[in-house]
Amino acid sequence: MTASAPEAPLLRIDAVNKNFGGFVALDNINVEIRKGERFGLIGPNGSGKTTLVNCISGALRPNKGAIVFAGVDITLLPANQRSHRGIARSFQIPRPFRSMTVLENLMVALDFAAHRHLLETEAHRRDSAMSILTRIGLASKAHTATGTLTQVELRKMELARAMATGPKLLISDEAMAGLSTSEVDEVLDLLLSLGSEDIAIIMIEHIMQAVMRFSERVMCLDAGKIIAIGAPGEVMANPRVQEAYLGT
């Protein structure tokens, strides 16, 4: 009996380099991420984390190497085309339309994604928006002005807008920064529930307890290079990680 071939990775980063003048921000990055994988990305400030996810999302283009998503080389594609193919990103500082309600904010994101999801009518998009808000625990805030939301509600709103595009890969950039312990748990539980839906998630986070609880694998960058990758416990026990990231 012939063994089945392993499933192709959802995302493949092949020998990616990114320079800013003479500064090497990323140095020969090679990594694969599976469909539905929960992947933690850590490292000290200036290690290359943001540059890497900017290259993945399309905000930057690498100087060398390739980025392959769902079997397609997207290295040269602009950010909007990557979004339509299934890459979404939430940011540390939410930037909603504060004069709009929570529901209206989500409708804007769904309008952008409409041609992918065949959400042909406003009623269909509204139903989809309410379904997302229910899933993330903001249904009761649907008609609330976004400018009145708390920090944790804004973070959930940011994740909801990312989810509205129907991503295969979600990049969560410091979604828990500045939150209380209980609020961190809320957002973490939400991300874990999204991961159970076969959405791959790259989490950039400085809260180590959250990274350990969330991630199936963790990668640590330092000075633009991968210094460790593997199970969370193994990475955190790595002396190079402790020296570079934890300062021990």
What is each PLM-predicted segment?
Residues 2-248:
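Glycine-rich phosphate-binding loops of nucleotide-dependent enzymes
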